[in-house]
């Protein structure tokens, strides 16, 4: 493996090699670093300082320059963008399947698919960042992406509207990580990192990241000035050990990869909490025929399924003189109130040729974590023949996020 570096940086391959009085000769923003390895994947870095990277981040505290307005192209189909590969792609398709929306691909190599349950909708498989870009350009109307990708490439553009912010997959956070050795051994917070005497205008903190919008924005908001950013694709955890960077800003899920590479997160260093979200083009919802109705159906299915996730229906028979008397017994137990209260129905049986009611059926909805306690309480109240089944959907009278969406659209 050989490392190609500009000559003005070859003198100082690691932070420990910098004399305190020696200024860094920063390369121009276009200077690129490449680690050439036998495998296909490589680490590519482009250095730039805060003032350079922040060309899209206003230095006077105002909003970044707006992206060009989306153009709603005339077409009959609503376009939904899904991630084209990886865990996010599989989880997005699985979630839609759980909502009885089946993505049908004629050929797995094709980038377009159909959802038979939504005949006016096409699915387009794209890279997550391209989903955001194409929502802005008007080539897509809806998309499922991580909030990190939306924030990095959407850059607070008002045409992007979050329809559902918590799809319960793709959980991670964007965080600063530093080495757990050397000069960083006793550094445990963002404040301590910023106050290290090693950083100055001549020798700034070198931060490797793929988030060249969120990174400088976060540092500016926290008043950290002496930072130089290096943009990178992949294998960021190796950058500090290679001497390319002092710290990294990257997505963290379990944190295992950081630990295996002798890196640690710091207090106050989390830039963003992220998970998958359903996003739409505001202009498409306002102007494209059928887009709003399609979003309404997708949103209702999502909300009903996600609300039911981890919930169970519990049914038991209970002897009693009346529904009122049984209800009082059931409601005396703290875990048996259900969503809005227990459903109590008479159980009819025949004795000596006559129909009578000696038992009442109790139906409640309980979360998974309270399931066994609820069963014990039902038994204690006189319940028997307890049946348990998982819930698939809970359709409310109204979908809260739908009302919020209409308000955001001014409808």
UniProtKB/Swiss-Prot annotation:
Activity regulation: Feedback inhibited by L-histidine.
Annotated GO CC locations: chloroplast; chloroplast stroma
InterPro entries, A to Z: ATP_PRibTrfase_cat (IPR013820), ATP_PRibTrfase_CS (IPR018198), ATP_PRibTrfase_HisG (IPR001348), HisG_C (IPR013115), N-reg_PII-like_a/b (IPR011322), N-reg_PII/ATP_PRibTrfase_C (IPR015867)
Low complexity: bias regions: 13-24
Record carries keyword Chloroplast: yes
Annotated GO biological process: L-histidine biosynthetic process
Tissue expression profile of the protein: Expressed in leaves and at lower levels in roots (at protein level).
Biased composition (Polar residues): 1-12
N-acetylvaline, modified sites: 50
Cofactor entry: Mg(2+)
Transit peptide feature range: 1-49
Main location as per UniProt: plastid
Keyword Amino-acid biosynthesis applies: yes
Cellular compartments annotated: Plastid, Chloroplast
Pathway assigned to this chain's UniProt record: Amino-acid biosynthesis; L-histidine biosynthesis; L-histidine from 5-phospho-alpha-D-ribose 1-diphosphate: step 1/9
Keywords: Acetylation, Amino-acid biosynthesis, Chloroplast, Histidine biosynthesis, Plastid, Transferase, Transit peptide
Catalytic activity: 1-(5-phospho-beta-D-ribosyl)-ATP + diphosphate = 5-phospho-alpha-D-ribose 1-diphosphate + ATP
Family the UniProt entry places it in: Belongs to the ATP phosphoribosyltransferase family. Long subfamily.
Record function comment: Catalyzes the condensation of ATP and 5-phosphoribose 1-diphosphate to form N'-(5'-phosphoribosyl)-ATP (PR-ATP).
NCBIfam families in alphabetical order: hisG, HisG_C-term
Name of the protein in question: ATP phosphoribosyltransferase 1, chloroplastic
Organism encoding this protein: Arabidopsis thaliana
Gene that this sequence comes from: HISN1A
């Amino acid at each position: 493996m050989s490392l190609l570096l500009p000559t003005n940086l070859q003198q100082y391959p690691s932070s420990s090699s910098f004399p305190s009085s020696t200024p860094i000769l920063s390369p121009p923003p276009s200077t690129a670093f490449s680690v050439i390895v036998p495998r296909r994947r490589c680490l590519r870095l482009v250095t730039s300082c805060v003032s350079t990277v922040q060309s899209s981040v206003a230095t006077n505290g105002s909003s970044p320059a707006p992206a060009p307005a989306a153009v709603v192209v005339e077409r009959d189909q609503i376009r939904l963008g899904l991630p084209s590969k990886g865990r996010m792609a599989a989880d997005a398709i699985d979630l839609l399947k759980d909502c009885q929306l089946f993505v049908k691909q004629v050929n797995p190599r094709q980038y377009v698919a159909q959802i038979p349950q939504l005949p006016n909708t096409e699915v387009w498989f794209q890279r997550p960042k391209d989903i955001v870009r194409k929502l802005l350009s008007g080539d897509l109307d809806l998309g499922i992406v991580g909030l990190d990708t939306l924030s990095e490439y959407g850059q607070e553009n008002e045409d992007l509207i979050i329809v559902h912010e918590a799809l319960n997959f793709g959980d991670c956070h964007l965080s600063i990580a530093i080495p757990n050795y050397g000069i960083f051994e006793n550094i445990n917070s963002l404040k301590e990192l910023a106050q290290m005497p090693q950083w100055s205008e001549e020798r700034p903190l070198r931060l490797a990241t793929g988030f060249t919008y969120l990174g400088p924005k976060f540092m500016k908001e926290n008043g950290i000035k002496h930072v130089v950013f290096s943009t990178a694709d992949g294998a960021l955890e190796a950058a500090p050990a290679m001497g390319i960077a002092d710290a990294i800003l990257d997505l963290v899920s379990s944190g295992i990869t950081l630990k295996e590479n002798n890196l640690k997160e710091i207090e106050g260093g989390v830039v963003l909490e992220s998970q998958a979200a359903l996003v739409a083009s505001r202009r498409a919802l306002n102007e494209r025929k059928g887009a709003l109705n399609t979003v309404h159906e997708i949103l209702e299915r999502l909300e009903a399924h996600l609300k039911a996730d981890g919930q169970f229906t519990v049914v038991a028979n209970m002897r009693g003189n009346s529904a009122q008397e049984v209800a009082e017994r059931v409601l005396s137990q703290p875990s048996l109130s259900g969503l809005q209260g227990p459903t109590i129905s008479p159980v009819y049986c025949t004795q000596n040729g006559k129909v009578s009611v000696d038992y009442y059926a109790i139906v409640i909805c309980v979360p998974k974590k309270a399931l066994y306690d609820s069963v014990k309480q039902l038994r204690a109240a006189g319940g028997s023949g307890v049946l348990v089944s998982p819930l698939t959907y809970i359709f409310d009278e109204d979908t809260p996020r739908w009302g919020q969406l209409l308000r955001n659209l001014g409808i």
